[in-house]
From Swiss-Prot:
It comes from Neisseria meningitidis serogroup B (strain ATCC BAA-335 / MC58). SUPFAM superfamilies: ArfGap/RecO-like zinc finger, Nucleic acid-binding proteins. It comes from the Bacteria. Keywords: DNA damage, DNA recombination, DNA repair. Residues 243-263 are annotated as: Disordered. This is DNA repair protein RecO. Residues 252-263 have a biased composition (Polar residues). Signal peptide: none annotated. The keyword Cytoplasm does not apply. The gene is recO. Involved in DNA repair and RecF pathway recombination. Involved in pilin antigenic variation.
């Protein structure tokens, strides 16, 4: 295969790791070429122009060459965008990057996924409330991967009804069930109201219940695809557990027998 060059391609940096003495191995998701592996030579040197450019969560314009799976990056430019995520939002960005990194194949172009990635990254970095955006992104990703069930019609051919109740499972259609139906122990599935499925399909979460059901459904499918779990989610859960322990430790009884926070 002859060597080819790509110039000024918009990408998002998904992950990077040291390569030999001073270089970086970068995994990036591009709009026209999908996920690509890039070797950024000398990028870890102090004088490298790439040090402040190869950052996650914001769009970057890059140029590369090479015919092998690992391309050589020879130029990168920050194209403007938004600030880096702060606080807990950082884990939202890491979570999105890990999903794309683990669920996409190299050099499989999906322009719609790049657009979805740009939208959710802007939301995570710029909005105080971005949970809706995460659920929308997860569902779009599952649809683009071809693993999301049809939420227009159920497995019997009927239209999803707002007042109905449905069983959602991986690798099969959505089926109507009675309101008292429960998923058997150790079985993978979510019982959800029809309105919640409609809201998930439309990406418009009208109630807290719809948003909670969306979380259950997207988590069900992601666990099915990635049974080993996600590091970003595990780290965030550890932080939450630490916060709960600290809150419990700092809560002391007052003289009237009630509890108050000591700090």
């Amino acid at each position: 295969m002859s060597e080819y060059r790509v110039n000024h391609e918009p990408v998002f940096m998904l992950a990077s790791s040291p390569w030999r003495e001073s270089s970086l191995w970068v995994e990036a998701f591009s709009r026209r070429y999908g996920r690509v592996a890039l070797l950024a030579r000398s990028a870890r040197k102090r004088q490298s122009e790439l040090r402040g450019v190869l950052v996650p969560f914001v769009p970057v314009s890059v140029s590369w060459y090479g015919s092998q799976e690992l391309k050589t990056l020879h130029r990168a430019e920050w194209v403007g965008g938004w600030r880096q995520p702060q606080g807990r939002a950082l884990f939202g960005g890491l979570y999105v990057n890990e999903l794309v990194l683990k669920l996409t194949a190299r050099e499989d172009p999906v322009p719609e996924l790049y657009d979805a990635l740009a939208e959710v990254m802007e939301a995570v970095c710029c909005k105080a409330a971005y949970i809706d955006d995460l659920r929308r992104f997860e569902w779009r990703l599952l649809n683009l991967l071809g693993v999301a069930p049809d939420l227009n019609r159920d497995g019997d051919g009927g239209t999803i009804a707002a007042g109905g109740t449905y069983l959602v499972r991986p690798e099969t259609a959505v089926f109507p069930v009675g309101k008292g139906f429960a998923v058997p122990p150790h079985a993978a599935g979510v019982v959800a109201p029809g309105q919640s499925l409609i809201d998930l399909r439309e990406g418009s979460f009208r109630t807290a219940e719809s948003l909670q059901q969306a979380l259950k459904i997207t988590r069900l499918f992601i666990r099915h695809l990635l049974p080993e779990g996600l590091k970003s989610r595990q780290v965030l859960e550890q932080i939450r557990q630490f916060d709960r322990k600290e809150t419990a430790r700092e809560t002391v009884p007052t003289s009237d027998g009630t509890a108050s926070n000591a700090v």
